[in-house]
Amino acid sequence: MFQIIFNELSAAEMSALPKRMQLNLLEQFQILPEDLDHLDAKHFGVIEREGKKLYRYRAKDYRIYFAQTPEGITIHRVLHKNTFRDFLFRSKLPVAEDQQLGKTREFWKLIEQGEKTRKA
């Protein structure tokens, strides 16, 4: 059975949003594993490092970072785009370059914080 799993950190980030925004984001994030083979560049990005693949989904002003797992999809982070832009600015990276982002330790530390938390 396909599941969308939030870890503790991404669940906390999602629950901090107003209920209406939560529902809007979840409504937009309609995805199946086979969708990952044919990504829409308008909404999706792929970030890779050392054989690890992470996906980014753009939903309004938020970015959902997730990975494909045998169970389905695990959501690692749900971040407001301005927060993420601040991170990119501090890292001196161009905003649109997922490949450059995948090479920065700071980004992967941010994701690993979510991975280390328990599933919600």
Regions inferred by a protein language model and the residue ranges of each:
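Short, cationic motifs built from Arg/Lys/His that form the positively charged side of catalytic pockets
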Residues: 24, 55-58, 63
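Short, functionally important structural connectors and interaction interfaces within domains
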Residues: 9, 31, 36-39, 71, ...
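Arg/Lys-rich, positively charged N-terminal/basic patches that mediate binding to nucleic acids
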Residues: 1-28, 101-120
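Short, intrinsically disordered, mixed-charge
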Residues: 19, 30-34, 80
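Enriched for short, Lys/Arg-rich terminal
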Residues: 62-63, 67-120
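A short, surface-exposed loop/turn module that caps and links secondary-structure elements
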Residues: 31-58, 110
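A generic structural signal for beta-strand entry/edge sites
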Residues: 1, 52-54, 70-72
